[in-house]
């Protein structure tokens, strides 16, 4: 019975993530999607769950014809703080400052997502500027 229960949970997990992303894309008229490349060195179970969610997110974006951009943690830190080895708190403080927030976003995943968005905005602006020089 356990394998069927496990498949049932995965089915609902995938369905929930897909529908949620699909709704966000449609309700907020999202043009592009930026995600962080996976990096896990400790908890394999967490890595698998995050990888599954990430795949579903990418599928939902693809079905909605939204380009997906990936950034490494080093690129995110470089794009937000200007230093690829910045500490998490430095990144959070810079995100708070750049977005004119009253306090550091919580939980940490929210702050990370905003940092990825800021990184992408900077990278996108640079890419457009470089295209204008051609």
Region spans (language model):
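Phosphate- and other anionic-substrate recognition elements at nucleic-acid/protein interfaces
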Residues: 1-134
């Amino acid at each position: 019975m356990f394998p069927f229960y496990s498949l049932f949970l995965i089915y609902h997990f995938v369905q929930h993530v897909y529908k949620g992303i699909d709704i966000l894309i449609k309700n907020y008229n999202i043009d592009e999607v930026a995600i962080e490349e996976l990096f896990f060195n400790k908890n394999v179970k967490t890595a698998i769950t995050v990888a599954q969610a990430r795949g579903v997110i990418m599928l939902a974006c693809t079905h909605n014809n939204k380009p997906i951009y990936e950034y490494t943690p080093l690129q995110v830190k470089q794009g937000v703080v200007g230093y690829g080895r910045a500490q998490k708190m430095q990144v959070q403080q810079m995100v708070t400052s750049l977005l004119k927030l009253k306090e550091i976003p919580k939980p940490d995943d929210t702050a990370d997502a905003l940092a990825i968005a800021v990184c992408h905005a900077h990278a996108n602006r640079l890419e457009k500027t470089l295209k204008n020089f051609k």
